[in-house]
Structures are given as structure tokens and as C-alpha cells.
UniProtKB/Swiss-Prot annotation:
SUPFAM superfamilies: TrkA C-terminal domain-like. One of its GO terms (biological process) is potassium ion transport. Disulfide bonds: none annotated. Belongs to the AAE transporter (TC 2.A.81) family. YidE subfamily. Keywords: Cell membrane, Membrane, Repeat, Transmembrane, Transmembrane helix, Transport. Residues 192-276, 279-361 form the RCK C-terminal domain. This is Putative transport protein YidE. The keyword Cell cycle does not apply. Its main location: membrane. It is found in: Cell membrane. The chain crosses the membrane at residues 4-24, 28-48, 65-85, 95-115, 158-178, 371-391, 393-413, 437-457, 464-484, 493-513, 533-553.
């Protein structure tokens, strides 16, 4: 059997064994995709015992390409929500998550100095303790750039594997501990979360208002400042028994009912100016109007602003809402359309059909993958990661590397959405498939390289010490921030659990948090809020630690 065939066969065996291990669950919690690492260690141990030699160059390529695929698809997935998560609505959650990342780095630095832990080993322990595989890849990349011998770099994978199991368990124990300390009633916490959503300022809501301000009588909608802003959309107007779609030039009269869409604060301000909130229904049922959701798939409208498409003037149709990457937004006139945007349209059936044809609304396109943008993005990411940054006092130029470069480029491209006919939208199923393939390849190689010496290190070497260091790196930041968030910020318990899981980019922990309450989406919402920024920081942190430790000697 050729070297290539043998290497591929062994990797396939690792994937099978590892994924099987990952599917084993105890009380609903398992290693998930992380099981591939342990599959690699098991197979690697027996491969080493049998004296089988695999192609080193091929393994190195597969490891790096798998890492590139993984971080790139993560960037494309979270890109649309990354910058939004930095805004005020998620600022508090992100600050606590950032604190967890910083504390983890500080604990790692203290352990490194006190116990003189070798740099590759301590970076591996850090990556395993926070259950973040891209951090492992980023750390190995920067160590190679700093000229660290290959055999020492491979130790990072072994120490990662030592710290990983408690990284998984530690987050779950922290959630349990918070529940025990504060005597949390999960059902009550879920109800509080739902109440806060109802009063939240970040959610898009609707309000029906009767025009009672005499100063607004016989004024055009465009002449009323609160209605002519990008913060509120007036999608329906009811006069007597007639329901219509208003235009900027529509004259409003006293007694008219307006259906407004916007954020809670803006709707309240509009109500103070216009009149009184009413419970009267402005449903399109039984009228010649209808409400329909259509998806943007036509390349010709990508990047165009809503105001430039003149849907109201041409078709008498109003866009009341815009859903982008699962986030409901006010469809302001300045908003630019991106591939995959979902538009909430109000108008007559024939007019809505006409607008649907303009924006595309081709559901099958959402399942197609444009491969050209994928490789353009990967290529640009690798180039970005290869740009040297010369810092005085360091022996080599610093780089973002094959983990940081593709991630940052994917975040940018995911946020941009499209350039001309090229769009970086990727169907969730395709994104997941490429992401899983990438991480399986990466972890399989890391496990194979670590497997030969793993058992000896655990039983006769410093393996138990490494596990102990990992416990400190996992537990101290999580417990400290958990207590701070609950005591001083009065954070909802379910929201706290989601934030803790997101700060560790840990899907098994999210699954555990979601199972705390069957119907509440609090944990998933906070997880998604902090995940993009934390993933970026987790990849950058080991590189910063490596550079700082290297500079300190």
C-alpha cells in the first residue's frame, strides 16, 4: 500500500473511532466532535506500537487545511452577527465573556511562570481547558513561526488532550454550582426572561396607534418626523373600514389607525406624539392585502438600498421587517440587501408577487453553494495570515497565521455579504458539512501525532500535573465571572448559563443549558450573542501568550 493510501486509511479509521466516541453520552453530555481527538490518540498509540510510518508532509497539509476550512466556515457563519453583537444590546454579555477570556489568559501566565511549564505544553493546556480547538491550531502555528522544534510543537496536542475532558465537565459543574449557591428556580428564571423580552429595547415589535394629535390632521406621513425616520415603519393604515398600504405622501387624518413596526422605545415615543395605543386589529385577513415573507436571491439587487428599489412607488408594497442571519431588523430605507435576507412584505397579492420576482425568492438557490467565493475567501484569508508584522525584540515577524487570517477575512466577507454577483452566503447545511470535515481532519492528525507518547506521559510523566493546571484554567474564570454576573449584574440564570457556554465556545455545554428548560431560548440567545467575539479572542489569545512568553524568555 502506498504512503498516501495508508495515511488516508488510518485517518478514516481515526474519524470512525473518534466520531463513535463523540456520540457516547452520559446524562446527555458527550465529547461531540472532540471525540475525534481521542480516537486519534487511541489509533496513534497502536500505530506507533506497530511501527507503521505515515507520510509526515501529507499529515501536516491535512492538519493545516482542516484548520483553514474550520475557521473560515465559522467566520462566514458568525460574520453577519459578529459586529452586531458588539453593539449595546449585547455589550454586557460580551464584557463578561471577555473577562472570562482575559482571566483564563492571566491564570495561564501565572501557572507558566510559577511552575516553569514549557511554552508548547502550557498553550496546549490552555486550549484544552477552554475546549477551543482553533486555539490549539493557532498556538501551533505561532510556535512554528517562532522556530520551535516540531517535536515540542506536537506536545501541545498531547497537553490539550489532557486538559480537554475537565474543560467539558468544568463548565457543566459551574452551571450546577451557580444553581446550588443561588437556589435558582429555573421555571421562575424562564418566566423572568420572557418578561424581559417583552419589555426589551432590542426586539422588533408592533403597535397600533389611533391618530389623536390635532396637529397631525391632514399632514403627509413624510412630514411627520417620527414617521419619516429609519427607526419606524408604518406598514398599514386603516381609515373607517378601509385598510391600505400607506406611502410617504399619504395624508393622515384624525381617527386613522396606524400599524407601526420598530423597537419598543421608538414605538413608545411615536405613541406620545401621535395619539393612543389601541387593541383594534389591523389584520389583512378578509381584505385585499396580504403579508408575505420573501427571500433575497437575485444577484441584481444585492448591495442595493431599499430606497433605491422604489417598491412602494412602483408596486404599492411596504417592507415592514428585514430578517438577516436570524436577527429581526427594522427595514430602514438605507438598509442594503444581502443574499439570504428575508423581507416581510405588505401589499396586494399581485404586487407582492411582482416584488418577489424582483428580489428573486428562489428557495432552491439557498441550497446551492457558490464555490468561487469560498476559494477566493480562503485564498485572501491565507494571504492576510501570511502578512508579516515586525515587532522590535522578537526573533521572527508575527503573523495572524492560518487560523487568524482566514477567520478575520471570513468575518469581513460574511459581514459584507456580497460583491457584485459574488455572495458569501453559505447554506447552513453546507457550512456545517465543511466545518465538521475541517475539524475532523485537524483533530485526527493532532490525535495521531500525540498518541505515541500519550499513555507514557499520563502514567509516568507529568500528565496528571497538566490535568491539574487545566482545572485551574477552566474553573477560576468561570466561577469568578459567574458569581460576579449573578451577584452584581443580577443576570438571569439561563442567560448566564448560555453566556458561560458561549465563553468556552462549547456546544455540549449549550446543549446542557438548553435542557435546563424545555421551551426557553434564553441560553441559546446569550450563547449566540457572545460566540462570535469569543471565538475570535480564543484564536488570538494563544498567539498573544506565545509572543509575550517568548519575549519574556
Amino acid at each position: 500500500m502506498s504512503d498516501i493510501a495508508l495515511t488516508v486509511s488510518v485517518l478514516a479509521l481515526v474519524a470512525v473511532v473518534g466520531l463513535w466516541i463523540g456520540n457516547i453520552k452520559v446524562r446527555g453530555v458527550g465529547f461531540g466532535i472532540g471525540g475525534v481527538l481521542f480516537g486519534g490518540i487511541i489509533v496513534g498509540h497502536f500505530v506507533d506500537q506497530a511501527g507503521v510510518t505515515l507520510s509526515g508532509d501529507m499529515l501536516h497539509f491535512i492538519q493545516e487545511f482542516g484548520l483553514i476550512l474550520f475557521v473560515y466556515t465559522i467566520g462566514i457563519q458568525v460574520g453577519p452577527g459578529f459586529f452586531a453583537s458588539l453593539r449595546v444590546s449585547g455589550l454586557r454579555l460580551n464584557l463578561f465573556a471577555i473577562l472570562i477570556v482575559i482571566m483564563g489568559g492571566l491564570v495561564t501566565a501565572i501557572l507558566h511562570k510559577i511552575f516553569a511549564i514549557p511554552l508548547p505544553v502550557v498553550l496546549g493546556i490552555f486550549s484544552g481547558a477552554v475546549t477551543n480547538t482553533p486555539a490549539l491550531g493557532a498556538g501551533q502555528q505561532i510556535l512554528r513561526d517562532l522556530g520551535t522544534p516540531v517535536d515540542l510543537v506536537d506536545q501541545m496536542g498531547m497537553s490539550y488532550a489532557m486538559a480537554y475532558p475537565f474543560g467539558i465537565c468544568g463548565i457543566l459543574l459551574t452551571m450546577w454550582l451557580m444553581r446550588l449557591i443561588f437556589r435558582v428556580n429555573v421555571e421562575a428564571e424562564a418566566q423572568k426572561h420572557e418578561s424581559s423580552l417583552a419589555n426589551g429595547h432590542s426586539l422588533i415589535q408592533t403597535m397600533n396607534i389611533r391618530v389623536e394629535n390635532p396637529n397631525l390632521n391632514n399632514m403627509a406621513i413624510q412630514d411627520v418626523p417620527i414617521l419619516n425616520s429609519d427607526k419606524i415603519i408604518c406598514s398599514r393604515l386603516k381609515r373607517d373600514d378601509t385598510l391600505m398600504v400607506p406611502s410617504p405622501g399619504t395624508i393622515i387624518q384624525a381617527g386613522d389607525l396606524l400599524h407601526l413596526v420598530g423597537q419598543s422605545t421608538d414605538l413608545h415615543n411615536a405613541q406620545l406624539v401621535i395619539g393612543k395605543e389601541v387593541d383594534t386589529s389591523l389584520s389583512t385577513r378578509g381584505t385585499d392585502l396580504r403579508v408575505e415573507r420573501v427571500v433575497v436571491t437575485n444577484e441584481k439587487v444585492l448591495g442595493k438600498r431599499i430606497r433605491d428599489l422604489h417598491f412602494k412607488e412602483r408596486y404599492d408594497v411596504v417592507i415592514s421587517r428585514l430578517n438577516r442571519a436570524g436577527v429581526e431588523l427594522v427595514a430602514s430605507s438605507d438598509a442594503s440587501l444581502q443574499f439570504g435576507d428575508i423581507l416581510n412584505l405588505v401589499g396586494r397579492p399581485a404586487s407582492i408577487d411582482a416584488v418577489a420576482n424582483v428580489v428573486g425568492n428562489a428557495q432552491q438557490k439557498l441550497q446551492q453553494v457558490q464555490m468561487l467565493p469560498v476559494f477566493i475567501g480562503i485564498g485572501l484569508g491565507v494571504l492576510l495570515g501570511s502578512i508579516p508584522l515586525f515587532v522590535p525584540g522578537f526573533p521572527v515577524a508575527l503573523k495572524l497565521g492560518l487560523a487568524g487570517g482566514p477567520l478575520i477575512m471570513a468575518l469581513i466577507l460574511g459581514r459584507i455579504g456580497s460583491i457584485g454577483k459574488l455572495y458569501w452566503f453559505m447554506p447552513p447545511s453546507a457550512n456545517l458539512a465543511l466545518r465538521e470535515l475541517g475539524i475532523v481532519l485537524f483533530l485526527a492528525v493532532v490525535g495521531l501525532k500525540s498518541g505515541g507518547d500519550f499513555v507514557d506521559t499520563l502514567t509516568q510523566g507529568e500528565g496528571l500535573s497538566w490535568i491539574g493546571y487545566g482545572i485551574f484554567i477552566t474553573a477560576i474564570p468561570l466561577i469568578t465571572v459567574g458569581l460576579l454576573a449573578r451577584i452584581f449584574a443580577k443576570m438571569n440564570y439561563l442567560t448566564l448559563c448560555g453566556m458561560l457556554a458561549g465563553s468556552m465556545t462549547d456546544p455540549p455545554a449549550l446543549a446542557f443549558a438548553n435542557n435546563l428548560h424545555a421551551t426557553s431560548g434564553a441560553a441559546a440567545l446569550s450563547y449566540a450573542t457572545v460566540y462570535p467575539l469569543v471565538m475570535f479572542l480564543r484564536i488570538i489569545t494563544p498567539q498573544l501568550l506565545a509572543v509575550i512568553f517568548w519575549g519574556m524568555g
